[in-house]
Curated annotation (Swiss-Prot):
Documented EC number(s): 7.2.1.4
Organism taxonomic ancestry: Archaea, Methanobacteriati, Methanobacteriota, Methanomada group, Methanococci
Gene: mtrE
Transmembrane spans: 4-24, 63-83
Organism: Methanococcus vannielii
Keywords: Cell membrane, Membrane, Methanogenesis, Methyltransferase, One-carbon metabolism, Transferase, Translocase, Transmembrane, Transmembrane helix
Keyword Transferase annotated: yes
Name of protein: Tetrahydromethanopterin S-methyltransferase subunit E
Intracellular or extracellular location(s): Cell membrane
GO cellular component: cytoplasm; plasma membrane; vesicle membrane
Assembly behavior: The complex is composed of 8 subunits; MtrA, MtrB, MtrC, MtrD, MtrE, MtrF, MtrG and MtrH.
Annotated catalysed reactions: 5-methyl-5,6,7,8-tetrahydromethanopterin + coenzyme M + 2 Na(+)(in) = 5,6,7,8-tetrahydromethanopterin + methyl-coenzyme M + 2 Na(+)(out)
InterPro entries recorded: MeTrfase_E
Source domain of life: Archaea
Length: 85
């Protein structure tokens, strides 16, 4: 198999993992905010409501982390192939 194809597959996998971990972090912080009475943002009334997940999805934060990984990996791959390692 072509090494470039393997590199791009690994990059896509890292981007997907960053997206999933960003979504999981958002869900975990929502639950933590619900149980903390001293939290700056009280999310208790929003727990379990679809609009909360929709707002997270359109904010794009988890997807932006995946994009950061993809851009950083592409730049690193280009520099390594240019002999700048």
């Amino acid at each position: 198999m072509d090494p470039t194809l393997i590199s791009l597959g690994a990059l896509a996998l890292a981007g997907a993992a960053a997206t999933v971990s960003g979504c999981a972090e958002d869900l975990e912080s929502d639950v933590g905010s619900q149980s903390n009475p001293n939290s700056q943002v009280q999310l208790g009334p929003q727990m379990g409501n679809i609009h909360r997940y929709f707002n997270k999805a359109i904010s794009g934060e988890p997807v932006s982390y995946g994009l950061y990984v993809a851009v950083a990996g592409s730049v690193a791959w280009a520099l390594i192939n240019a002999g700048l390692n």
